[in-house]
């Protein structure tokens, strides 16, 4: 029997869902979601926002974690076997409030419909300004791991967005479209365009982390990526089929076995 191993996540449901395909000897020790690395460009600046309407503990935790910059101070100090980092939530962009504070434009925060947010400056993912903030924040995150002696446990996940559906799921997808229209040709065409545009924007972010910061990276080829029409979180270009998560886990296993690769 293998010794118990632990993983900490800085990223999205993509990494979180992939951990379900790890062996039973793995435990999820930490999950820092909805927290753009771009906000790490500025130190902790708690904005004066009314968060009382956040209904779930998860919503409260991720929004407060974003404001507190929890990923940069908790993960470098956490005794885990691997820190898995994905950049999916960078797509959300960030908001600069009137006082200069940076917060991630998460669905939880936007859903509060606060006047401080509606009048704030939005810094969109993919713009030069967002990328410049990301470079500073990502560098701080990696530096914190390096200073704690845990940077070799950091692995970046590079898995492209997709609108491709596996052969076994295509008939099911047609049935779902006939039932409720959620997977209509128009919807799937939009997903394909969004996936292509977003993947192009992500390339310089991935290159910076992999090449400039020297972080070990798992790349999942597009031919191994497919979405799941019946994914528990719904139809989206980053809600993958089981085979994609298995490919992620295989890459993670190789990266752990050879941390210098």
Question: Where do the language-model regions lie?
Answer:
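Catalytic nucleophile-elbow at a beta strand-turn-alpha helix junction centered on a G-D-S/GDSL motif
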Residues: 5-60, 83, 88-89
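Short catalytic/ligand-binding loop motif for oxyanion handling, primarily in non-cytosolic enzymes
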Residues: 15-19, 40, 91-96, 162-168, ...
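Oxyanion-hole/transition-state-stabilizing segment in secreted/luminal serine hydrolases
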Residues: 61-129, 161-169
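Surface-exposed cleft-lining segments at the edges of enzyme active sites
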Residues: 110-141, 187-196, 236
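Hydrophobic, aromatic-enriched interface-forming segments
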Residues: 120-178
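Acidic carboxylate-rich catalytic motifs and surrounding loops in phosphoryl-/glycosyl-chemistry enzymes
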Residues: 156-160, 214-231
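Substrate-gating cap/lid alpha-helix
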Residues: 166-219
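Histidine-centered active-site loop/cap adjacent to the catalytic His
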Residues: 232-261
């Amino acid at each position: 029997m293998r010794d118990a191993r632990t993983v900490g996540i800085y990223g999205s449901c993509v990494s979180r869902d992939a951990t379900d395909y790890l062996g039973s000897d793995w435990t999820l020790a930490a999950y820092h979601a909805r927290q753009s690395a771009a906000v790490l460009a500025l130190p902790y600046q708690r904005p004066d926002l009314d968060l009382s309407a956040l209904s779930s503990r998860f919503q409260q935790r991720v929004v407060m974690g974003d404001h507190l910059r929890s990923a940069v101070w908790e993960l470098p100090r956490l005794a885990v076997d691997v820190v898995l980092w994905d950049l999916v939530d960078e797509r959300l962009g960030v908001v600069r409030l009137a006082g200069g504070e940076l917060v991630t434009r998460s669905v939880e925060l936007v859903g509060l419909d606060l006047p401080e947010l509606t009048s704030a400056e939005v810094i969109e993912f993919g713009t030069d300004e967002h990328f410049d903030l990301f470079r500073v924040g990502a560098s701080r995150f990696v530096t914190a791991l390096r200073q704690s002696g845990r940077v070799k446990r950091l692995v970046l996940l590079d898995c492209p967005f997709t609108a491709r559906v596996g052969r076994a799921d295509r008939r099911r997808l047609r049935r779902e479209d006939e039932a409720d229209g959620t997977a209509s040709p128009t919807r799937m065409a939009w997903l394909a365009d969004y996936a292509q545009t977003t993947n192009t924007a992500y390339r310089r972010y991935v290159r910076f982390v992999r090449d400039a910061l020297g972080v070990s990276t798992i790349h999942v080829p597009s031919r191994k990526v497919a979405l799941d029409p019946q994914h528990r979180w719904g139809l989206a270009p980053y809600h993958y089929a089981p085979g994609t998560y298995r490919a992620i886990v295989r890459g993670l296993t190789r990266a752990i076995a050879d941390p210098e690769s």
